[in-house]
From Swiss-Prot:
Source organism of this protein record: Calliphora vomitoria
Record keywords, A-Z: Amidation, Neuropeptide, Secreted
Principal subcellular localization: secreted
Family indicated by similarity: Belongs to the FARP (FMRFamide related peptide) family.
Biological process terms in GO annotation: neuropeptide signaling pathway
Statement: the UniProt record of this protein carries the keyword Secreted: yes
Keyword Secreted carried by entry: yes
Location within or outside the cell: Secreted
Protein's name in the database: CalliFMRFamide-6
GO cellular component term of the entry, any: extracellular region
Record PTM Phenylalanine amide, positions in chain: F9
């Protein structure tokens, strides 16, 4: 997972 992947939540 990328660093910005968590921003999808």
């Amino acid at each position: 997972a990328s660093g910005q992947d968590f921003m999808r939540f």
